Amino acid sequence: MGWGIVPALPGVARAAAKLSGMQSWRASLLWFDPEADGPRPHFESDGLLVTAADAAGVQRVVAVGAYDTLRPRYSDVAVHDRRGRLIAPGFIDLHIHYPQTDVIGSPADGLLPWLERYTFPQEARFADPGHAASVARFFFDELLRHGVTTVLAFGTSHPGSVDALLGEAQARGLRCIAGKSLQDRHSPDGVRDETEASLRDTEALIARWHGRDRLGYAITPRFAPSCSDAQLHGAGALAARYSDVWIQSHVAENLDELRWVRALYPQDRSYLAVYERFGLLRRRAVYAHGIYLDDADRALLARTGAAVAVSPTSNLFLGSGFFDYAAAREAGVTLGLASDVGGGMSFSPFATMRAAYT
């Protein structure tokens, strides 16, 4: 979480107050300035946050700090008094499945039975654009209720599911990166896609959404077992062609899944190595879970710049295991926290952080 602060001379700021739509809020403030201070937080118990519109009409942070220090500089700017409340940057959820919103808390004996029994039947409903739009609205309502303003999200295998999600995010001015799930094998009717059509759909979605307002696209192989070699090869080719898009998938979440991958890909050293072979490890690649990685895998992640989305509530609920934070940090792996709804039990980042501390 962080605010990009636009420098402004006090005299210029006052003169431009009416023209720029300048506003300010008095409250307790928590913020980060990673370029100046790394991960160190800043806190003001009585702070002032000042914003103004840029040339495009987007509100930007002009100043943030102690109320007594900043108020004289912006004395003619109206103040919204929110004392007793905390203002902070929005949270980021690094891995979430919006189509699984309605399967939260559905019990099963591990990941693979859970997918078959609950997830795939629910995701098949997203062939209906009306259903996708309804869930997208509720999904963002819940995220905002819990202070989340940026997500890296899975759609279903239906392109319309991504259109519904990104369209809703755009309407609300939120930061959302999402992708259509690629899964041309080992998936039931209703969610299984066709190899060539899935790649054409992915490229069309990139053209339609990537870089539009605050939106981005993620090439999204569901996980290696759900994708044929041809589909993974095509995904890697798209990742090379569109180097600024994201990649998202799952890796090493569950022991049964791990055994399945070994049977499907005996030529690869590890589950993660499958993605490497198809050109799917690089910066802007995010892999969820990563519970059963070894030292060579962690070194590969650090070398390629790919990141892991740690999903503690999901890992606990589905009985998958515990992530090795110490080994990942020692190897220099980039990490982020994720709710992994609907395997995860809550949209709340605080619930995710509590589970991570367990």
Model feature map: region roles:
Residues D102-S134, K180-T195, N254-R284, T304-A307, ...:
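Active-site gating loops and adjacent loop-to-helix segments of metal-dependent hydrolytic enzymes
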Residues L49, Q59, G84, H95, ...:
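Divalent metal-coordination and catalytic microenvironments
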Residues M1-R73, R85-L86:
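N-terminal metal-binding scaffold of metallo-dependent hydrolase/deaminase domains
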Residues G173, A239-D244, L280-R283, L300-A309, ...:
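Glycine-enriched alpha-helix->loop->beta-strand junction motifs that scaffold or abut catalytic
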Residues G160-G290:
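Metal-coordinating catalytic core of metallo-dependent amide/deamination hydrolases
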